[in-house]
Amino acid sequence: MVAEKETLSLNKCPDKMPKRTKLLAQQPLPVHQPHSLVSEGFTVKAMMKNSVVRGPPAAGAFKERPTKPTAFRKFYERGDFPIALEHDSKGNKIAWKVEIEKLDYHHYLPLFFDGLCEMTFPYEFFARQGIHDMLEHGGNKILPVLPQLIIPIKNALNLRNRQVICVTLKVLQHLVVSAEMVGKALVPYYRQILPVLNIFKNMNGSYSLPRLECSGAIMARCNLDHLGSSDPPTSASQVAEIIVNSGDGIDYSQQKRENIGDLIQETLEAFERYGGENAFINIKYVVPTYESCLLN
């Protein structure tokens, strides 16, 4: 009877009835994630379940190399070069204290080529302008010195600096037309000079080049657009500007922007024209994508 009275009282007062608890959705138990272990490829750790294999490092083919002190700078600071900076109404140029034809090319020309690695004023200006002056007046003295120029040229190209590469290519274009047989004498050294050109051959970026002074006779034989009437020297750090996917026909003030891919193509064509019958096959061996400008 007492139980019946309690049920009747609960029915009359539903608020007093005990509330049912709602069942929540069952949550999945947390799963412990193992700590990932970074490992090198082809090692014992790489076979573990929680290992993450690190990818291969970048090859760095286009990465610039650090510069080293050059012999040209040491000789210039010591005052061993018979040159001085001359100022006139047109700009700055080299004033030679002796006749260029009387210089010892075996001593001076390799030193000036060593200065191709320089990128600061006045070293870069004296080195590049001095090279073109000596090539213009060298004549028969250039060919015997050619083996001594290969290592400085190779060192300049191996810096992978776009500005230095462009200027070195212009120097090579001038070198092959500076005297007879120089182009043919360069053929055995293609394997030392051309590998870097093969890397940058398809690069399409424009770089500013300082204009230098060169005679019209030399300009008529090779594409040296950056050579002109004496202009103020400009250091590489001041003129280095990249314009991707733009041509080389833009001329701002006295600085000529050159496309590095086009410069390499022009240089290889100059090598083939002046290198004789064996030039093309040796170029093709190092630069497989090069197509002959004479056979086609």
Curated annotation (Swiss-Prot):
Tissues/organs with expression: Expressed in all immune tissues, spleen, lymph nodes, thymus, tonsils, leukocyte and bone marrow. Expressed also in heart, brain, skeletal muscle, kidney, lung and pancreas. Expressed in primary Schwann cells and very weakly by monocyte-derived macrophages the primary host cells of Mycobacterium leprae, the causative agent of leprosy. Component of Lewy bodies, intraneuronal inclusions found in the brain of Parkinson disease patients.
Top-level taxonomic group: Eukaryota
A Gene Ontology term for the protein's cellular component: cytosol
Localization per Swiss-Prot or TrEMBL: Cytoplasm, Cytoskeleton, Cilium axoneme; Cytoplasm, Cytoskeleton, Flagellum axoneme
Alphabetically ordered keywords of this record: Cell projection, Cilium, Cytoplasm, Cytoskeleton, Flagellum
Ranges that cross the membrane: none
GO biological process: cellular response to unfolded protein; flagellated sperm motility; protein localization; spermatid development
GO molecular function, one term: alpha-tubulin binding
Pfam families: ParcG
Subunit structure: Microtubule inner protein component of sperm flagellar doublet microtubules. Forms a large molecular chaperone complex containing heat shock proteins 70 and 90 and chaperonin components. Interacts with STIP1, PRKN, GPR37, HSPA8, TCP1/CCT1, CCT2, CCT3, CCT4, CCT5, CCT6A, CCT7 and CCT8. Interacts with MEIG1.
PANTHER family, per database record: PARKIN COREGULATED GENE PROTEIN, PARKIN COREGULATED GENE PROTEIN PARK2 COREGULATED
Protein purpose: Microtubule inner protein (MIP) part of the dynein-decorated doublet microtubules (DMTs) in cilia axoneme, which is required for motile cilia beating. Suppresses cell death induced by accumulation of unfolded Pael receptor (Pael-R, a substrate of Parkin). Facilitates the formation of inclusions consisting of Pael-R, molecular chaperones, protein degradation molecules and itself when proteasome is inhibited. May play an important role in the formation of Lewy bodies and protection of dopaminergic neurons against Parkinson disease.
Extra remark beyond the main annotation: Linked to PRKN in a head-to-head arrangement on opposite DNA strands and share a common 5'-flanking promoter region.
Protein name: Parkin coregulated gene protein
